[in-house]
Swiss-Prot record:
Enzyme Commission (EC) number: 3.6.4.13
Name this protein carries in UniProt: ATP-dependent RNA helicase dbp3
Localization in the cell: Nucleus, Nucleolus
Reactions the enzyme catalyzes: ATP + H2O = ADP + phosphate + H(+)
Motif DEAD box: positions: 232-235
Gene source species: Aspergillus terreus (strain NIH 2624 / FGSC A1156)
Organism classification: Eukaryota, Fungi, Dikarya, Ascomycota, Pezizomycotina
Pfam families reported in the protein's UniProt record: DEAD (PF00270), Helicase_C (PF00271)
Amino acid sequence: MTKRDYQNDTTAESRPTKKSKGEKKVKETKEKKEKKVKSYVQNPSLDTLPQAEIDEFLASNSIKITDTLPDATPLRPIISFSHLPECNSNLYEQLNSFKSPTSIQSATWPLLFGGRDVIGIAETGSGKTLAFGLPCLKKIEDSKKKKSKPYQPMAVIISPTRELAMQIHDQLQKFAGPVGAKVACIFGGVRKDEQREVLKTANIVVATPGRLKDLQNDGSVDLGKVRYLVLDEADRMLDKGFEQDIKDIIQPMPVSKRQTVMFTATWPPVVRELASTFMSSPVTVTIGGDPSADPRANTRIKQVVEVVKPHEKEGRLVQLLKQHQRGAEKVLAFCLYKKEATRIERFLQSRGFKVAGIHGDLSQQERFRSLDAFKTGAATVLVATDVAARGLDIPAVKLVINVTFPLTVEDYVHRIGRTGRAGAEGHAITLFTETDKAQSGALINVLKAAGQEVPEELLKFGGTVKKKQHDAYGAFFKDVDTTKAATKIVFDD
């Protein structure tokens, strides 16, 4: 989208009598999207399913699909891998290790295979990478005859953290071979020369916003041919201040030929505004409850809250590890501050536990080593700050322990979301102290919404929810929906 197109799109309402180029482009784009949906051939085995069975599947998995195109034909969810559209390669072979698609995959795959723009709102650990990854690879397979020039990727996936970017890259690599796709992973802390080399032949670029923008600015990558764009964990990227970087990255990408996918755990006004700016007639797929309401925890996670005194936490942590950890089972222990994480890591090492740490003071190589040790079992306890609370997909985390409660209940939900992933049961234990009582009301709401037991000691702190605060304005802050038109105010003479 060029700067001029963007301006035309945002000012279209002010000039209703004359259609701008921007308006025409949006109209053309919608027509193209509708045409693409018609090109999606639904697997015949889906046609034979009774509508009642489809309705039951959507209801039982709390799937809500909202289409901005009123005349669009509803597409049936892909309930089984056997319902996937035909493929000329062995792209689907790796799926044999999975039992069935997750809810977000079932609901979004037909839409994404059909070329629609999609907003996916779902909890972490719900299988989002394959939800957007499989249609991306199918798109590359279908366009094999078109030769791409060096440094011109067909697909770009933007992620908030290097750890998540690496995770997405690794998972896509497993499926990329059969279609001959090359996947590059781009993030800061690595020499640009090495990254320029892999960008030369990459069909798919998985990147963090800052480094991708740097390489874009110095001419190392041309995004003018991107046909598939994914913004993964969009809410997290905006929280980290990447909004302008994202806009700059998207600016040279084609409008009418680009399919845009956005995945997010929450749906605040700032994310809605970004979606309305860059997406064309998107379909919104929501898994679970109202995403604009209070944060909701994964109901498969058993949440236990223990109210303790601050000086009791270290001793209780050791007791919990001895009680719940067996053999090489993985445990994530979250701390609030970097120095606290370092202290807890050393404390557990002195007690004979195999421990690794990950926090902001560590170099990139040190983080990689810690994560690798945890994944391979060389370390069975990972002590982390919130830098690791979102985006990391470490299989089979047995238990999450919150040594110190985070600053917000949203961070609490993201922390405990490291367990109970991909349909598995999870377990999270939180050590809550009087110094955390400002968060007691919000925590009680999360526990109740997930059907968890609320301890009497926690109820004694009260159920009042602390008023949301802005980083700069504190409590004097109103969460305004910027997508709504401003109210016109007329002053008398």
